[in-house]
Structure formats: structure tokens, C-alpha cells
Amino acid sequence: METTTGRARYAFVSFLMLNDSYLPGALMVGYALRKQGTHADRVCLVTEDISTVARNALRRVFDYTVEVDTVYVPHKRRQERQDRPYMFTRMNVLRLGADGDLGFAYEKIVVLDADVLPFKHYDHLFTLSAPAGILNEHKSHFIEIDAEGQYVVPQDVEMTGTWKWHRLYDSVCPHGHRIPKTITDRVSTDPLNLGINGGLFVLEPSICEYRAIMEDVRRPETLEMVGDLFDWPEMQYLTLRWSGQWTNVDVRFAGLNGYPMLSVLYGTHFGGLKPWQFKREKAIRRWGRYPDFQVWFAEYTEMVSEVHPDLRKVRRLQRLLDDIHELNRHLGDEGLL
């Protein structure tokens, strides 16, 4: 994974943008990748809003912490999600290549959101043709749910490691294969179609592509899509922009909410409630007992208590550790653990 000059050819890239609230998640991405023994660099992009305390914490688990500009693309339904106009800030990852202006020369990067927890096999992602990502047309393709809204886990999943997503796509575009353009083009006629999941991308950085995207999203016809029709602007936009070029990534690399079971996953994606959002007390008491949250809690406790105890000097991180201990005591008393 190195060039002849000894510099890494590849990098995992995550983000901390706008404020420090996702700091625990970003730290866990870097820590989990380090535990896998990856030889790729670990890079965290931050915006100017991120505190010095948070940046210093990130340097404990990332090789590089790089400040980038915030990209603002107006969205008519910002009131539903305050971060919607800033989602294209993630496109700064395209500046990390040899032609970029951030001082790096990566040939390929794996882009991970801070709410993804990698488990294993993530270096394999660098072998895939870029762009690559997990086909995520609808949540119902990821998770099977019964009439009462409860998860339905296929009886043979522990043996096969596959479920509904694989039944839908394995015959057409299995892991590592090109996704037909007819599939990714569906986003253009169905705004509810999420396209390629933005929580995990495999990309080849190109500042020319970055500049082209920045120019394109200012065009009125593009702005109508990314500034109104799309709930996930940059994700659905990229699905269409690179339609016909995408390589499919197995959903096991970022199974949604620990579904169907952690033992068959290579990573999990915390959609909705995040394991560090203890201000949502009722929700965290409900979901905190489930295996995906418990694994995140255990890994976080290991990171701040054993491997990087200096992180406990950060008030936010110590408070989270205390909250985790208190929640687990409560769950234990209730017989839920």
C-alpha cells in the first residue's frame, strides 16, 4: 500500500464538520481502522468550526487532520435537517489526489462517515474499481421488517451470510461488479430512491472532478435537484453523476443498524440514533441494549480507558464514558443485558 517513495498510496477518510458533536464517532472510525492493522493512512477532514480540543483528540487516532472549506449549497427544506446545505463539503475528499491542493497524492480513498463502525476486511475495499459504494435504493432492501415493525432475521443468515439485499442484487451486480446504469438512473425519476449509500465510498481523488462538481451544483437545473428534490443531496447527485460507472460493495461492509446480526457483518452503519447521543434519553435507553450499540460502547470504553486514556481529559468524552457506564448499570438492573 506504499509507493516507491514510501508514501501511502491509499487512505481512509472521515469527517468532522460544522461542530464537535460527532467527535466520538469520528474517533471510533480512526480507532477501529487502526485495530484492523491497516497500512493505509487515516485522514480526518475538519471544517474551521471544529475546536482545537477536538482536533487534538483526532490526532490520537488519525495520521492526518486536515482543515477544508465548508461548501454551502442552499436547500429549500433545510428546516428538516440543518446540515443539508453543507453535505457537499464532503466532496473535499476529491482534493486528496496527486493533482490536488491539500498536499497529498492518494491514488484511491475509502470515505467513511463518522457513524460507521468498521469491523474487519476494510483493506479489501482498495482492490475495488472506483467509484464504488453500497447500492441502497430503499431501506426495505437492507432490512426485512414484519407487520409490527420488528426486524425479521432470515433463519439461514448465519450460515449463508446473505439476506434480502443479496437476493435482489447478487444475480445482477454482486460485490465487486459494475452496477448497471439502468439501476442507478432510477434516482432521476424517484427522489425517494437513495441510490448509492454515502456512508461508504471508494473513490479516486481528482481535483478536476471536484471543480467540475462545484461548478455543476450551481447550475439552476442541478440546483433544483440537490436543493429541493433530493433528501440526501450529495449522495443522490453522485449516484447520477457517475451512473454506469459504479462498482457494487457488499452491504456487509456497513450493515444498517447491526442487521441482521453482527457476526456476519464487516462493519455497521448507525442510521438514525447514534451511540453517543445520550441527550435523547428515551431513545438511548431503548436502543442502547442492542448488540450494535453494545459493541460500540465496548470499543469506545476500550479506546478511552485503556488505549488512549488521555482522551478522558476531554470533558465531552469523559461524560460519554460515564453515561455509558450508567446506562449499562441501568440495563443490568432491569435484566436487559
Indicate residue ranges for each PLM-predicted region.
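Short internal beta-strands
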Residues: R42-D49
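Short, acidic, metal-binding catalytic loop of nucleotide-sugar glycosyltransferases
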Residues: A32-A40
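Catalytic metal- and UDP-sugar-binding loop of GT-A-like glycosyltransferases, i.e.
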Residues: L112
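Short aromatic/hydrophobic "clamp" motif used to bind/position activated sugar donors
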Residues: I109
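Conserved donor-nucleotide/metal-binding helix-loop-beta segment in metal-dependent transferases, i.e.
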Residues: P118-M159
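Active-site-proximal specificity loops/subdomain of glycosyltransferases
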Residues: T52-A105
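Charged, glycine/proline-rich intrinsically disordered loops and linkers
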Residues: R81, F142-S188
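A glycosyltransferase accessory/donor-loop signature
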Residues: E2-L16, Y22, M28, R60, ...
